[in-house]
Amino acid sequence: MTADAAVHVHGLEKSYKELRVLRGVDFEVARGSIFALLGSNGAGKTTIVNILSTLLRPDAGMVTVDGFGVSAQAADVRESISLTGQFAAVDEILTGRENLVLVARLRHLKGAGHIADDLLARFQLTDAAGRRVATYSGGMRRRLDIAMSLIGNPPVIFLDEPTTGLDPESRLEVHNSVKQLARRGTTVLLTTQYLDEAEQLADRIAILHQGRIIANGTLAELKQLLPPAQVEYVEKQPSLEEVFLAITGHDGNGSNNVNHSRLATTPPTTKEPR
């Protein structure tokens, strides 16, 4: 086990009756890094997160989080982590600030209002602080959810498919929030089925397939697993998501460099009947 690993998983197994979900999973997450667990639906990503969060007991293997064993020291693990599920766990009746204050008080922290205001500013939600969460966009709800999970400054945070169901603009908002977490030293383990999300965010990526980690490394290391590509000079066409973000001014550069005149529709020409 690496000394500076915030999360260590070795030989992890889990079955539901006859269904073997995890078949000997091994990986480590370095402190202060973003680690992406990439896999299709049903690969076992959420099962791993639930075990790491002490919500589910493993059948076999050794799992430690922040130096604590998830089975023998579950209470210590829960003090060290925060979990954000696939859907934002926010109270729609309350305002954004009230949600944060409530969590701070439930954790018996002093200065709940100050904590709330600091997180609102950190996640660019100050202007919406007094609005009910029911009026928030999907991206705003997810950012608030992540902000709530940081109350108490947990060293490790688990994000289970944090952009599920979000539009491209909201996904970009969440991506920026996740990058901010790592810059401040928080260890982030996120699960995703979006390849571009893992590519953009993660320091290391593990691919989970049929209950096993079949590849684990940096993006550059994973690319080395493919045979050398044949060099061809082609014009790179933007993806639809890149077009959408550029047109709406959310391409990450803060500018809109789109030639809107080219977007004007022209009726198709038709031949006159003879």
Which ranges hold each PLM region?
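Catalytic Walker B motif of ABC-type/P-loop ATPase nucleotide-binding domains
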Residues: 157-161
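Conserved ABC transporter NBD signature motif
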Residues: 61-72, 76-77
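Conserved ABC ATPase "signature" region
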Residues: 82, 101, 105-128
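ABC ATPase "signature
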Residues: 216-217
